[in-house]
């Protein structure tokens, strides 16, 4: 496990088949974040009859993001197997793309983090809250910590990175 050090680049990802949030950190400091959005009206039209193509495009977009930032550390939300096997299969392809990048890259660390783990690390009490309430907590945490208004996809990726930094510095 790579400990945050000088000149260290970290990329955290909250992946899905249609919207994947990402956050980039240098030397344990937040720098930039965004969302790969394949859920726009234009994209829905493009992928209407071909969901496999959407997954391929998401995998390529995530790969290109990894190539652009060349992280020393990759933090990604751990896949929770659900009853929806199709969703699990699709998400495993996106996560597999990230894992492949890690395998093929020298001096890169890969860390899977559970949502309960990063929420706990950042002091977010998840308790018996519903999914939408948990997403809102993440959005509010980013607003209060970084002064940045973001979507839940982006806020989750930022929080994952911040939690990793807190855990290993």
What are these language model-derived features?
Residues 1-169:
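Phosphate- and other anionic-substrate recognition elements at nucleic-acid/protein interfaces
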